[in-house]
Amino acid sequence: MKVAICGAGSLGTILGAYLSQADVPVQLVTHNLAHVEAMRDRGATVVGTVQMSVPVDARTPDQMDGPYDVVFLMTKQLDNEGTLHFLEPMLAEDGVVVTLQNGLPEPLVASVVGASRTIGCTVAWGATFRGPGVSELTSAPDSLSFGLGVMPEVPGYKTEQVRDLLSKMCPVQMERNFMGARFSKLLVNAGFSGVSTVMGCTFGQAAADRRSRVWLQRVIKECLDVAKAADIRIEPIQGIDVAKLLDYDNPVKQAVSFALIPLAIKKHAGLRASMLQDLEHGKLTEVDAINGSVCRLGAEHGVPTPCNDTVVRLVHEIERGERTWGFQNLDEFED
């Protein structure tokens, strides 16, 4: 079997370390030459809630040498189409692309490589890139999991093959209602990632501050309303029914939802959103693929999304240097 992680950044480096430790022949691929050289010299180093340093096969994209049986797609979605056209000729005849990305990437992936070669997957853990060769796992070790889509067009043996690979790192939940699982992750990203990014803080800090928690709750509520309108049944995350816990239709349920938000994110309180990490390094973000996905789907189904709209606007203004992240940005959300 030949495996590649395309986009070995904060998350991909950690997955690659686990797979390499389990003797899986996996290539960690990234454009970051300094990161590649560091991993070649010292291995992939994982710090944070887990400590390890593992020899890995690190490469730049021009050094890829398929055919690949499995490609874990972990790049940002800023140029998914171009990335997929680059990867498609390097897939084995029954090779698959596994979408470990934010947002709703599967339709575009399937349009390029084919539905029978596209497997959706959600990632329920977080990481922070700490420099060449080093990534920090920021989620508690007992809270790590993947949600692997059981896609009807994909042969069962390929799904099992991917499940077996991912299970070398942490538990894998098989998701037959994958859109529901994808939307569960999307509402967490839109809420906690979106709001914490414009504030410049961790998930836990955004949830702890009562003022920001108001807007975090409203962003999540918009996601839930959009899902209902689109007839998407949201799946539990790691056994937690986020829709049941956080949705509300009266003041009492709203108060309960508000109180539960810090508890819901407790094991991931130290996470810094990948969007915030991008902004800190002067890079463009995936906000259009995260909060923007909620806005677009809401528009299709006639559901207003003013809070998600505001997150998208603020993040783009920060990207352009027109504002900076910070708690002062909470003033931009309208009452």
Predicted feature residues:
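Nucleotide donor/acceptor-binding cores
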Residues: M1, D69, L144-F146
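NAD(P)+-binding Rossmann beta1-loop-alpha1 motif at the extreme N-terminus of oxidoreductases
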Residues: M1-Q51
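Active-site-adjacent beta-strand anchor residues
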Residues: I5, V29, L73, T99-L100, ...
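Short, charged/polar "capping" segments at the starts of alpha-helices
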Residues: A34-A38, E106-L108, G156
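Rossmann-like NAD(P)(H) cofactor-binding subdomain of soluble oxidoreductases
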Residues: Q51-E136
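Internal alpha-helical scaffold of NAD(P)-dependent oxidoreductase catalytic cores
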Residues: P89-M90, V112-R117, V134-D241
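NAD(P)-dependent Rossmann-like dehydrogenase/reductase catalytic/cofactor-binding core
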Residues: Q217-D335
